[in-house]
């Protein structure tokens, strides 16, 4: 594996203690800067004990700040943070704690956008809230050093280092394809873990959906670049369009054998719009709203332009 070759070459270099301290000092600085974009999500449940006394239970999750304006700070978090919550509180890295509310959710990808009104903060407090920089995950390469932030160790504001071990391109998923990054790094997807490059940019978020049955120690991350269009919709409170199709492009070879160009359907998710419209495996989706579908990227782009409802 590439990361083993990298380690082997590093081991050959006669690093001094000063070199190591400088290298790890730079990494600590990078982690500290990235951590300023991490927020703690307190998922609060209001319950009663055996004696009918009101009690509160709180779950802890990590989110990443996507945008910061005083009237609205937006935090991307896993849907687990809101599934059983009666109310939400958001604690920023400077310890400011404010009520949160769900702005929009994408259950297909397991993500939710939480909004916070920060007008009660003074300028000094607000300036400590740092929106994350979105990186280009298409530029991530096998062997790259990466950092997981959020809750990789199960606690908010924990972190871990590792290498990209493998990149799976064009992985089939509902309504398109995606790039999945595999890294030998700590990660806890349901608590909120986010992947950063060495520029301090967000390049992915943790998911359990594509982990292998055999425990290899590899953790999986969805590519942020594949999700930027949907991320903009969530930020504006718009529901991400959903058809519920799993399929593959009709190749030129398939066309030579008489198939129509478009997307060959492999499955339709139960109770999805595609399923309810009667689409089934073997059908070919050749267009959306009179626009010809010529490939998977084109299909994904057209789905994102649809309006829910």
Model segments located where?
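C-terminal cap/linker of serine protease catalytic domains
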Residues: 14-15, 26, 198, 202-258
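Active-site-proximal beta-strands of protease catalytic cores
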Residues: 38-40, 73-78, 139-152, 191-213, ...
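PDZ/PDZ-like groove recognition
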Residues: 55-60, 189, 235-302
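Catalytic-histidine neighborhood of serine endopeptidases
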Residues: 68-112, 116-119, 128
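Beta-strand/loop subdomains of soluble extracytoplasmic proteins
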Residues: 84-102, 141-145, 157-170, 179, ...
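Active-site region of chymotrypsin-like
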Residues: 119-131, 160-217, 255, 259-267
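Flexible, gly/ser-rich surface segments that form the specificity/activation loops bordering the active-site cleft
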Residues: 132-176, 211-214, 231-236
